[in-house]
Design a protein with these regions (language model features):
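Active-site anion/phosphate-binding pocket segments in diverse small-molecule metabolic enzymes
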Residues: 2-27, 31, 81-82, 101-103, ...
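Basic side chains
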Residues: 38, 52, 87, 143, ...
Length: 380
């Protein structure tokens, strides 16, 4: 992504800044988190890193390259277009496409990505295309439904699946996998253990029926931390690599820090109002700072009107007025700052989990909401 360049003026003069809003990706933090999760696994266990949804908002290409260097064994994306972008940018690791879509099989095959297969129809469509190209033993990953009830084969569908696989030399099952619903919720561990037991049963039955042993994987980030005895042959590391742990009190290093620069400082008089709807009300001596980020940049409108505070030189400054599409305002009264100074939206302080709590959501949503127009910068 090209850098944004803007001239902006304030009482301290005109400042020219490149990437006046950016998402910094801390390479050391990512490496530390990778080593932490790697330490929970047996040496033989492969580690797959999820880089779907633009790597949870962190920048798909940038983060995939970091994981390729860190030693990940596999990557996974949600849709083919995400994997194609990685391939175009030199990512050579095996890539599982979790939601392949029958229309995209030719591109998946051309770029040697590996589709997840959730139903027999998808497998039949893929096999026809492979047969037309004279290809054999193409790697596929069979998705089992053990309780999410979203995608995947259920027990009653396994006999037909096995029969088809035994007569389809065009494909070879590289792995059998499923997804845990509530591995991060201890109060629902009984259900998680039911899922794990069902996965063991279904995956064993399918392996026996096809006559060979594909890899198996079922653990997500929370599962790696809380149920490592079920690591099988591979695990899938998602939110954990980005700095969110499922364990109470376990603090991982946040990889992403959303930062921007102050565009303008304004000194208001009592009674002045701020922003759309005039929701911001100035007290005597109020000083506000305008920032170049708004709800189009992932700053939820519910964080306006003082609901959230961002960090300016180590001081917390509350929002004032409504969040705009491309800008928001902070009350920086009493905080020494000037045009061009740095503001942290989330990172070390405040943490992304704090904003998620304010919004009644999860850190995933906050991170994935940072759009591509915000430049990603890898910090070593």
């Amino acid at each position: 992504m090209s850098a944004k360049i803007l001239n902006f003026a304030g009482k301290h003069g005109t400042v020219t800044e490149i990437d006046f809003s950016r998402l910094e990706l801390n390479l050391k933090a990512a490496s530390d988190n990778f080593r932490y999760f790697r330490s929970l696994l047996e040496p033989r266990t492969k580690l797959l890193v999820l880089v779907k949804a633009n790597a949870y908002g962190h920048g798909g290409v940038e983060f995939a390259a970091m994981m390729q260097r860190a030693g990940a064994d596999y990557l996974a994306v949600a849709y083919p277009v995400e994997g194609l972008e990685l391939r175009r940018n030199g990512i050579s690791l095996p890539i599982i496409v979790l939601t392949a879509g029958n229309d995209f099989y030719p591109e998946i095959i051309r770029t040697r990505m590996e589709p997840s297969i959730p139903n027999l129809y998808s497998l039949q469509q893929l096999t026809e295309i492979l047969r037309s190209q004279g290809l054999k033993d193409y790697p596929v990953h069979i998705k089992l439904d053990t309780g999410m009830h979203r995608l995947g084969f259920v027990r009653s569908e396994l006999p037909a699946l096995a029969e088809f696989l035994k007569t389809a030399p065009e494909v070879r099952v590289k792995s059998i996998f499923s997804h845990l619903c509530v591995a991060d919720e201890p109060e629902q561990d009984d259900f998680t253990r039911e899922q794990l037991a069902l996965f063991e049963s279904l995956s064993t039955s399918l392996s026996d029926a096809i006559g060979y042993r594909p890899m198996r994987h079922v653990l997500n980030s929370a599962g790696i931390e809380r149920f490592p005895e079920y690591q099988y042959d591979m695990v899938r590391l998602g939110i954990g690599i980005y700095g969110i742990s499922a364990l109470p009190g376990k603090v991982l290093a946040p990889v992403a820090s959303f930062k921007c620069k102050i565009l303008q400082i304004k000194h208001l008089k009592e009674g002045d109002t701020v922003g759309y709807g005039r929701w911001g009300k100035a007290r005597p001596g109020t000083v506000i700072a305008t920032l170049p980020v708004g709800y189009a940049d992932g700053i939820d409108r519910r964080l306006g009107r003082g609901a959230a505070t961002f960090s300016v030189h180590g001081h917390r400054a509350p929002t004032i007025g409504n969040i705009c599409m491309d800008m928001c305002m902070l009350d920086v009264t009493g905080i020494p700052c000037q045009v061009g100074d740095e503001v942290t939206i989330f990172g070390e302080d405040p943490k992304v989990s704090e904003l998620a709590d304010l919004l009644g959501t999860i850190p995933y949503e906050i991170l994935a909401s940072v759009p591509r127009r915000i430049h990603r910068l890898v910090v070593r």
